[in-house]
Each structure stands twice: as C-alpha cells, then as structure tokens.
Amino acid sequence: IALKCRRHFVTIQVGEACPFIEEILSTISSIICDLQTLQVHTFYEAVGYMISAHVDQVAQEQLIEKYMLLPNQVWDDIISQASHNVDILKDPEAVKQLVSILKTNVRACRALAHPYVVQLGRIYLDMLNVYKVMSENISQAIALNGVVVTKQPLIKNMRIIKKETLKLIAGWVSRSTDNSMVLENFIPPLLDAVLLDYQRTAVPDAREPEVLSCMAAIVYKLGGHITSEVPKIFDAVFECTLE
C-alpha cells in the first residue's frame, strides 16, 4: 500500500485536516508498541516510502526528523552513556538495541534513498566510532578466548552492528545523487575507520567480508570521483585478504 499509494499519504485528502503521514508520525509510538522487532523494521520502511514521495525538501526533512525521533532518542542515550563509560558498548542489552536501531536505519535508507542523508549525517561519526569500538571488543574477546567466542550471542550481535553499519553506508551511497558531496563528506571518515580496522585485524575470522562488498559498491557508484582513493583501498584490503 505504501509503495503504490505513497503520494496519497503526504497530500491532504478530502475530509482530512492534514496529510495522513502527519497522523502516523504523531502516533508512531502507540502504533509500534505491540509490534515484533521485524514488524517495526517493515513499518519503518513503509513509512519511509510515504515520506519519499514528498516534493518539498524542507517539509520532507522535517518529516524525516519526526520519523526517526524514537530510534534517535535511544541512540543518543547509548552514545551519551558511552562517552562517559565506553564499557556500556559491551552491555548485551545496549548492543541488542544498537542492532535494532541500525536495522531500522537500513530500512529507512532503502525507502528514502538520497534524502536519508539528513539522518545519516546526524549519526554518521558516532556510528563509525561504535564500529571501531565493536572491532576492538571482538578482537579482545578472540585474543582471550579463541575464535570459538564468535559463536556467543553478544559477540555475534557486535558483528551484526559492524555488518549493518557497512550495509547502511553502501546502501545509501548506491542511492545517492551527489557524488561530490559523498566523496567530500562521507568517504574520508569511512576509509579511516573501516580500512584501518580491516587491515590491522590480526584474526581473519574477525574481519567482515562486508567491508569488501561495501568498498565495491562505493567504487562502482562513485567511479572516477574516487579514483584517487583506490590505491589506499587496495593497500588496506588486498594483501591481507589474500593471506
């Protein structure tokens, strides 16, 4: 319904005081409170398709802000706690919440496409910092307990955070419409965080293959714009992957 009728949700229909999307966003907490996690993710994707149909950029950005309010509140709370005590990012419940929030963002990005940039810009640097901390946590756990530790639920969820982060970035870049903006604002911190982590991860089992698919998607999308960064990408991923 959201896909086929998206324009109807963002324009005022006969008998309505405001577009239906406004009503959905103002009651979103009561709508999702009884849904399972997977249903919440599907709901967010559906609402994202509705918002993507809005033709006014300013109004659309305001809708996106309301739309992401709930996950952003939880995200901000965890990031705030982590800024005082990074060990919160080893807490199973916090890690589980981050997994769900990132999956929600992946679905929102899929639906919104390039306009998702307003949300991505809000969480981007914190998300890359979380990525680096998760890598350190995973490497420490493997060093202490061996590769078998990667089967534990907490470590699995830490790896999912890394995978969903890469999926989110690759998904948005592939849908973006401004290559120069992507290259200037999003690629430098990404390469610094992800490539360095991949290269220095001593245990092959701790490396995420999604790093390779993310880099491939970015190079494919940006083409000639990213040529200058290709040697850096090769230096970080080629030799250590083959080994």
Give the role of each language-model region.
Residues 1-243:
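Karyopherin-beta/Importin-beta family HEAT-repeat alpha-solenoid scaffold
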